[in-house]
Amino acid sequence: MRIVVGISGASGIPYAVRFLENLRGHDTYLVISEAAKKVIQYESDENIEYIRSLASHNYEDDDFSAPISSGSFLFDSMVIVPCSITTISKIAAGISDTLITRAAAVSLKERRRLIVVPREMPLSTIDLKNMTYLSENGVIVAPASPGFYTKPKSVDDMVAFVVSRILDLVGVGNDLIKRW
């Protein structure tokens, strides 16, 4: 399975790391935004080199010659995790000024699965309208909202819950959580 992963500058880097760790064995294409590089320094015990090592292919966010910027490059899904509100707003407005937003535009125009994982809260009416617009256009909006029916004992358990749901959405089997 070919999966494009964008890490934007929102809080929630542990979700991205755990997601990539669970995609081993799949063909992954990673883009880390400039803002995400800064957030990684604040939020993660992992460095950028480790995160990049989890992906099969890595691209800079300004590399418009990357294959994922073209509709002729076939991939199964794109996941932006975490997805900043700025990135959601750009995608909703059709702004493709970074590789992440360009690959998202490709996903939309080619009718490929696009999943955005916002972590922000509270949300403004504008944020909600942008997410609604994306959802109406086929994007899966999967907020990083852990469920508590699994009785998490740690932050890692809560991260596992969200990542398990994202993996389910892209069709990657996992046993990160106890299922009903």
Swiss-Prot record:
Which top EC class is given?
A: transferase
The residues that cross the membrane are none
Recorded E.C. number(s)?
Answer: 2.5.1.129
Role summary: Flavin prenyltransferase that catalyzes the synthesis of the prenylated FMN cofactor (prenyl-FMN) for 4-hydroxy-3-polyprenylbenzoic acid decarboxylase UbiD. The prenyltransferase is metal-independent and links a dimethylallyl moiety from dimethylallyl monophosphate (DMAP) to the flavin N5 and C6 atoms of FMN.
> Which UniProt keywords are listed?
Flavoprotein, FMN, Prenyltransferase, Transferase
Tell me which family the UniProt entry assigns to this protein: Belongs to the UbiX/PAD1 family.
Catalyzed reactions per annotation: dimethylallyl phosphate + FMNH2 = prenylated FMNH2 + phosphate
InterPro entries, per this entry? Flavin_trans-like (IPR036551), Flavoprotein (IPR003382), UbiX-like (IPR004507)
Q: List the disulfide bonds.
A: none
Note one Pfam family from the annotation: Flavoprotein
Q: Which SUPFAM superfamilies match?
A: Homo-oligomeric flavin-containing Cys decarboxylases, HFCD
Instruction: Give the binding site residues for FMN.
Output: 9-11, 33, 84-87, 119
Instruction: Give the protein's recorded name.
Output: Flavin prenyltransferase UbiX
Q: Where does dimethylallyl phosphate bind?
A: 149, 165
The family database entries (NCBIfam families) matched by this protein are listed as: PRK06029.1, ubiX_pad
Name the domain of life this protein comes from: Archaea
Molecular function via GO: flavin prenyltransferase activity
